[in-house]
Amino acid sequence: MHMGAENMAKKAAKRKNTRKNTGSRKNGGRNRLWIIFAGCCIALALAVAAVFQKPVRRHFSYPMEYEAEVRRACEKYDLDPCLVFAVIRTESFFTPDAVSGAGAQGLMQIMPETGEWIAWRQGKEYDESRIFEPDYNIDLGCWLLSFLLEKYKGDVELAAAAYNAGHSAVNRWLDDPKYYDGKNLTIPYEETENYVKKVKDAYEKYQFLRESEHEAGRE
């Protein structure tokens, strides 16, 4: 009886150890699966962040909406797209139906009389019904920007000031030694001064982002 009881106890202990070892192996397997799963999630998150980091940054802080229309007009009028994006961002923040208190309209905030003058210089009829169409508005604005850059020999500050205040006002300032010393222009309009700063800052940012994307593409 004693030996039988001892054998039964040994068998019971063996079964207990077997169940314990099996449970440990199962728990170990589950832990390894969780570790692998967590690693895959982290790797996927990093990959997604790398792919979408630039577009998210670009489109939320410094959008490049209507890119096809902008690039088409820039090729037509020999402009840097970064400058046009900077002007649109400053003028309307890419809102195609924007209307200012003064009556400027669309993405590049074209005044009706300015639109008529641009169309006349282009030898075309001004179509006010299309002023909120991105391609039409951008074409008018890019023509004007190109005209001003040519007039002021590529000076972005003067061109931006003229885009905001009109080239007649800028011409007066340039002829007045109180505002222009032959090198530096003091803009007497606070609104225009702030506008020029915003355009220049945005232009530099768009150029930086473009260069960053080119560098990333070469890696």
Where are these regions (language model features)?
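Catalytic glycan-binding domains that act on GlcNAc-containing polysaccharides
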Residues: 49-219
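N-terminal Lys/Arg-rich, disordered targeting/topogenic segments
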Residues: 1-31
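Hydrophobic membrane-insertion alpha-helices, especially the h-region
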Residues: 34-52
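Extended, non-globular alpha-helical segments
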Residues: 26-37, 109-110
